[in-house]
Amino acid sequence: MSHRKFSAPRHGSMGFTPKKRSKRHRGKVKAFPKDDPTKPIHLTAFIAFKAGMTHIVREVDKPGSKVNKKEVVEAVTIFEAPPMVIVGIVGYIDTPRGPRQFKTVWAEHLSEDCRGRFYKNWHTSKKKAFQKHAKKWQDEDGRKSIEADLNKMKKYCSKIRVIAHTQMKVMKHREKKAHIMEIQINGGTVAEKVDWAREHLEKQVPVDSVFAQDEMIDCIGVTKGKGFKGVTSRWHTKKLPRKTHKGLRKVACIGAWHPSRVQFTVARAGQKGYHHRTEVNKKIYRLGKSCLTEEGKKNGGTDYDITEKSVNPMGGFPHYGLVNQDFVMIRGCCVGSKKRPITLRKSLIVQTKRFAHEKINLKWIDTSSKFGHGRFQTHAEKRAFMGKLKKDLIAESEAVKT
């Protein structure tokens, strides 16, 4: 009996089907890390905005490797991560069908960024959202009911999460509505978690209080949208021979005569990109402060590069601008386009690999222009090389005349 002498596995994974547009623009956390009561209280996720990429030079600390104590160049991604504001507390109880929401307590004051997310058109609306919740904090009976809800959470709940939102006013984006998400609190007892959340209502939480230097995290987001694509681009099927009738970038056989329908496993043209994806094990190379603070004005320097510069490249990141708030630098690339909100989450697994525990020693961060082949790291370096330009001479002559 004859048979083919070669193997031809299917092209593309069925694990990501259906390949359709994501329902949400921001990455959704579908699982939080396992709670450990022995650890101190901490949040497990944060929302940041993708700014762009650059590259760094670091010294490898890996005994036994060929590159040990040598310099390597690696690509990094920069996320702008202004502090998030906690505006609510949610308690969950365990049921046979999984965790169920038990009680929710909202803060008294919510910003327009946060309330605007609940309206399709905030400008023309009556802006009455959360008035009933605010009135509870203003009279004695309302405050008693809030305290009663918090006490019930301490007694019956097994999981405590906070409702936090981003601050869009400090970002130079056109987007005005804040991104809101529930973030699980891990560590400590349930009563301690509720007290911690109660103390931090209406307060800002910086990104360096959630993550640490050299920590391994996960990035959850929506990929770049590519639109309607053909089967070769979408599933990476093999192109047909040159003399094929009616096209080459197609699937020659889409199934048998019977059953008289095309199975879902057959590669077809359709939507590519804008899919919800989770990328695991991204190492944090640096947690930087805002360049608007005195400490953050040199957030682009290192112990080896003492130049006073920020992490922003000359001219800013393409299609994003300048990163003025706190930032997170991770190794490698990440899903999503510029300005897209990316959810950063603590790793779900116990890290055992040597790279996860390696101390990162940055020697240099590239800040040359990303709009072309940049050769200068700072504006001062460019001025020193170029000398006086024509516009400088014109400005000096006009100053003398006046």
Curated annotation (Swiss-Prot):
Subcellular location: Cytoplasm
Pfam families recorded: Ribosomal_L3
Gene Ontology CC: one annotated term: cytosolic large ribosomal subunit
Gene source species: Toxocara canis
Biased composition (Basic residues): 18-31
Source species, domain of life: Eukaryota
UniProt similarity note: Belongs to the universal ribosomal protein uL3 family.
Positions of region (Disordered): 1-35
Function: The L3 protein is a component of the large subunit of cytoplasmic ribosomes.
Keywords in alphabetical order: Cytoplasm, Ribonucleoprotein, Ribosomal protein
First-listed, main subcellular location of the protein, grouped into a coarse class: cytoplasm
GO biological process: translation
Name listed for the protein in its UniProt record: Large ribosomal subunit protein uL3
Lineage: Eukaryota, Metazoa, Ecdysozoa, Nematoda, Chromadorea
GO function terms (MF aspect): RNA binding; structural constituent of ribosome
